[in-house]
Amino acid sequence: MKHYSIQPANLEFNAEGTPVSRDFDDVYFSNDNGLEETRYVFLGGNQLEVRFPEHPHPLFVVAESGFGTGLNFLTLWQAFDQFREAHPQAQLQRLHFISFEKFPLTRADLALAHQHWPELAPWAEQLQAQWPMPLPGCHRLLLNEGRVTLDLWFGDINELTSQLDDSLNQKVDAWFLDGFAPAKNPDMWTQNLFNAMARLARPGGTLATFTSAGFVRRGLQEAGFTMQKRKGFGRKREMLCGVMEQTLPLPCSTPWFNRTGSSKREVAIIGGGIASALLSLALLRRGWQVALYCADEAPALGASGNRQGALYPLLSKHDEALNRFFSNAFTFARRFYDQLPVKFDHDWCGVTQLGWDEKSQHKIAQMLSMDLPAELAVAVEANAVEQITGVATNCSGITYPQGGWLCPAELTRNVLELAQQQGLQIYYQYQLQNLSRKDDCWLLNFAGDQQATHSVVVLANGHQISRFSQTSTLPVYSVAGQVSHIPTTPELAELKQVLCYDGYLTPQNPANQHHCIGASYHRGSEDTAYSEDDQQQNRQRLIDCFPQAQWAKEVDVSDKEARCGVRCATRDHLPMVGNVPDYEATLVEYASLAEQKDEAVSAPVFDDLFMFAALGSRGLCSAPLCAEILAAQMSDEPIPMDASTLTALNPNRLWVRKLLKGKAVKAG
């Protein structure tokens, strides 16, 4: 059985209060002065005090082979903040730290270890507040208002480095080669790791490690680093430092899924919902000049305009990409929303998904068999459902304790206001008719003979994304749906969690004393007119799922209060995020892809044209991480996702999968 949780560190604290691994019989940091050793070995060994002021780019990337207690990261973060305070006009503005950890500490052990360094407390408290649950893969933490990014990869580093996307090659400015001593943990210190470090290192990048072991030095030299010994810290005689003095060839394992960014930093975003709002923030944080064109007279009038939307992950035992993406997207979304400096109605009250028939019970049983962390999802028996949700259903299910609901419309509006304060320009009632290349830019033609020219364009306009010649063949479809707004009752007022069944029901919003119940589903429709049939069907589905519940029968939809919207979806339930693929060129270039993979060129795409679409009914869960992925790709920065899952988000995926099998591809 595949496990979807990570085993925590098995440790104890010695007489000095230093954490010691029981499995590796080694300390996490020196009993003497771990903080000073970190400064000497890793910051000094990589000459960061000198390199920070001279760095020619706005971002400095550090990678590390063992996160442990986070001492190296916290020490570096402190030094980076001190550098920024002393050099506010320096080119270097942001720090990106990538670390791999097979056995992460629990939050409690992390906090206990951090008591060793009171001077690091301001930084340690921020790390503890965002410490992720033990799920495999990449967890992105945005710290210090986004000026510091931490990518925590949970799992075996030798496995994870082989799963990294090619876009991370030659991105690392400095390596911290840390971990338990080679004699204690020989499985980590492999030639495979050294080769991966060399592949990821930028030409001119450096490394430092506490060990001076000969096989480590020789392995790093074989990988491509120029190595030298340096005086060790304290009682240690020697340590190793290295430089990547050559430019290694860049491998591309799957060119048909290759992602390209842009050398430009000026962009137009087409849309007015949660996708365009969150992407605007992510790009502004990276120094982009951003303009947003919305077809409506105000934001969030489309699919992002609902009063309440549920936040919980979409899990699947049989779809690895779906499971990996949504579990990590959900945890990122919670961290993101919790630190977002805007107000919006929400309640992280939990979400319970109920097994109301044999099929749904089987699906839930499969999810519960995946060894998920209890922080993510737990089983709940029928007799306990009433206790945790407040209403009787006679159904068992699965509870997502960190889930809940939020107001998408308010979130979108307030995020855009925040983005405007940071420089976003918004143009309302600009309906894009078509776009074309002109002099290395994109010419945008709007209704009413309005025009604009921009270096880069992102299409984030929901179900209308396929209305342009460049996107008309995308395999996406529209789904119209109606959400009913129902007044509360004494029984409904007791509802404490979001209920999911063959529909969903939210607790009442204190702002209006109403609940949301929905939603109808009409594939291929873009009709947003009120439907009395849909209103009654929303009520009837609730009754059918809980036939013994009197409170369900008392739901009143007679006041005809509802909201109709149209979503954009795909048949594999995953978003489309990345370069807009060139359909005609893809068919020509990849006509013989199944037989000629070794000769494949990079994926044919439209230059400087990107898309952020097909969020379906899970946009509140997926949009924050998708915005971060796309902004990182566009900016040529590290992307917080493994290669196979990124492949599953690529807009060309459905075409390429068929071509790889030698099958014909049809548009749409």
Swiss-Prot record:
EC identifiers of the protein: 2.1.1.61, 1.5.-.-
Reaction equations catalysed: 5-aminomethyl-2-thiouridine(34) in tRNA + S-adenosyl-L-methionine = 5-methylaminomethyl-2-thiouridine(34) in tRNA + S-adenosyl-L-homocysteine + H(+)
Sections of the chain in a coiled coil: none
Pfam families in the cross-refs: DAO (PF01266), Methyltransf_30 (PF05430)
Region (FAD-dependent cmnm(5)s(2)U34 oxidoreductase): 270-668
Stretches the record annotates as tRNA (mnm(5)s(2)U34)-methyltransferase: 1-245
GO biological process terms held by the UniProt record: methylation; tRNA wobble uridine modification
Localization in the cell: Cytoplasm
This protein's UniProt keywords: Cytoplasm, FAD, Flavoprotein, Methyltransferase, Multifunctional enzyme, Oxidoreductase, S-adenosyl-L-methionine, Transferase, tRNA processing
Transmembrane annotation, as ranges: none
Protein name (record): tRNA 5-methylaminomethyl-2-thiouridine biosynthesis bifunctional protein MnmC
Organism (species): Shigella sonnei (strain Ss046)
